Amino acid sequence: MLFLGSHVAMKKPHNFQGSIQTAISYGANALMVYSGAPQNTIRSKTEELKIKEALKIAQNNNLSLNNLVGHAPYIINLANPDKTKRAFAIDFLSQELERFAAMKINKMVLHPGNYLKTNPQEGISLIAQSLDLIFAKTKHLKTQISLETMAGKGTEIGKRLEELQQIRTLVKNKTRVSFCLDTCHLFDAGYDLKENLEEIIQKIDSILGFQNVSVIHINDSKNECNSHKDRHENIGFGKIGFETLLKIIYHRAFVCIPKILETPYINEKEPYKHEIEMIKTKNFNPELKNLF
């Protein structure tokens, strides 16, 4: 069965209840939310999120809890060599895991971090150490952190599959570390999904293990392979292309994994209902952008 949805906003006054209702209106049976704005660490109290109401609506619409995905804010950097800033990140992510657990979300996607003025290996080590501390603080939880593949901008860690696996290898509680594949990021990092898809999928299995992939972000790319730009494009309008993305979405290796669209708004409007329909029908609509 296809589990497909998109990022959905969580806004007051309806909060998580509104997110679930929005996803259902898109024809989705999966979704991803931030517990607040992705650009900051300001968060509402958990009791204000309308969790009970949200979960009832999800249940009534056959939206499985296993297909609900959380995402940590972009500004968190577990590879930061500054001890004070890293300590803040550890505390905040521990609180985020508590919030998502209260929302019955069992996986939180995380951009691994930027090594800044150190080096990749030092960054990888700091991320693993930080994850150990986070899991120790939240040992009563089972919520996973899903490390995302990155495009390789600046000093990002995660542009190579091996870097993500190194982090998991170093972490003590490996059951709480999984992986999020982002199609745009993989392509921009140099994995040519269009020309070498099956070879790359086999690499994913041999390096990360299919069983450790918990989320897939489905995005086209505005830029060529190996550009390290990380600029998402609407499905079928970028350099990866509709047919290649369909092959990934429907690939037998990923059949049980929730796929999440993070494509850009068109004229400030969400395209997700239409993109989900294109994917379900396997029929690309070249006029999509003219609908808004």
UniProtKB/Swiss-Prot annotation:
Swiss-Prot/TrEMBL cofactor(s): Zn(2+)
Give the family, as the similarity comment puts it.
Answer: Belongs to the AP endonuclease 2 family.
Q: What gene name does this entry carry?
A: nfo
- Enzyme class, spelled out: hydrolase
Query: Taxonomic lineage of this organism?
Result: Bacteria, Bacillati, Mycoplasmatota, Mollicutes, Acholeplasmatales
Q: Give the protein name, as stated in the record.
A: Probable endonuclease 4
GO BP: any one term:
base-excision repair
Alphabetical list of Gene3D superfamilies matching this protein: Divalent-metal-dependent TIM barrel enzymes
GO MF assignments: deoxyribonuclease IV (phage-T4-induced) activity; DNA binding; DNA-(apurinic or apyrimidinic site) endonuclease activity; phosphoric diester hydrolase activity; zinc ion binding
